[in-house]
A protein has these predicted regions:
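Short, aromatic/basic-rich helix-turn unit that serves as a nucleic-acid recognition element
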Residues: 1-28, 89
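N-terminal DNA-binding recognition helix of tyrosine site-specific recombinases/integrases
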Residues: 19, 27-37, 63-98, 149-151, ...
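A Lys/Arg-rich helix-loop hairpin that forms a DNA/phosphate-binding surface
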Residues: 19-22, 35-60, 207, 233
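Short, basic (Lys/Arg/His-rich) helix/loop patches that form interaction surfaces
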Residues: 41, 126-130, 196-208, 215-236
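Basic, Lys/Arg- and aromatic-enriched nucleic-acid-binding interface segment
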Residues: 69, 73-77, 92-150, 168
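Feature representing long, continuous alpha-helical segments
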Residues: 119, 144-147, 151-155, 184, ...
Length: 236
């Protein structure tokens, strides 16, 4: 990636604007953070990459960093460009990720579910073998009530709950993605979900569910509830 950035920088003022370089530096930062967290090293050789790498990177960007699909699409495009450059220069034996399709995503604000769709989700019932489905549904509903991102929801604990002078319950936390302090007054539905999902065996407010599992469950929930709009974690 450093080779690609250096090549692009040599074109500044010719066919590339200086401002556009920030996207490449952002991609480099996200890749490095992912590699350090996942593999506990500062860099990987092309021979160490598998086709699954890009999907794990996607789960990291969307789940842990809280980015939208349109943001990851740019990261994936840069990664593919780097792999083509490496193959061309003889640094990689295979053309990695060439046939992997990544959805572009929508840069516009995600469309929200209407009350009818939310009521359909609330009405769903699950048996003992569908615990993850029930958890995904409740976490998603809590996200709808609060507007909080998945990565923030999974880190919320009892210390983030505060009461004002009127006795109303609030969430107070810093967003992982931006560091901005958020204060969210909890609606009655959100309070009921906290009580429902409460457990003395953990410190977090909500049960942990892995991001890929969460997304898969949301797809299944949509079909089961008969909701036509293809919602994701970002829709909340």
């Amino acid at each position: 990636l450093d080779m690609l950035i250096k090549e692009k920088e040599s074109h500044i003022g010719i066919d590339i604007k200086e401002g556009s370089m920030s996207a490449y530096h952002s991609t480099r930062k996200r890749l490095q953070e992912f590699i350090q967290r996942k593999y506990h090293v500062s860099d990987l050789a092309f021979s160490q990459l598998t086709e699954n790498f890009i999907y794990e990177l996607q789960a990291f960007c969307l789940g842990e960093l809280g980015h939208q699909q349109s943001t990851f699409f740019r990261v994936a495009a840069d990664l593919k460009t780097v792999c083509r450059l490496a193959y061309r220069e003889g640094l990689a034996d295979t053309l990695l990720f060439d046939k992997v399709h990544i959805e572009r995503g929508d840069k516009k604000a995600p469309k929200a579910l209407d009350k009818e769709a939310l009521d359909k989700l609330k009405a769903l019932c699950f048996d003992e073998l569908e615990k993850e489905m029930g958890t995904a549904r409740d976490v998603f509903l809590f996200a709808c009530y609060t507007g909080a991102a998945y990565c923030d929801l999974m880190e919320l604990s009892k210390k983030h709950l505060v009461r004002d002078d009127a006795g109303s319950l609030w969430l107070k936390f810093n967003r992982q993605k931006t560091g901005v302090l958020c204060r969210i007054k909890l609606l009655p539905g959100a309070v009921r979900l906290i009580e429902k999902m409460h457990s003395d065996e953990r410190e977090t407010l909500l049960p942990h569910i892995k991001y890929p599992t969460y997304q898969s469950c949301l797809k299944a929930l949509r079909l089961r509830a008969g909701i036509s709009f293809p919602f994701t974690s970002h829709t909340a």
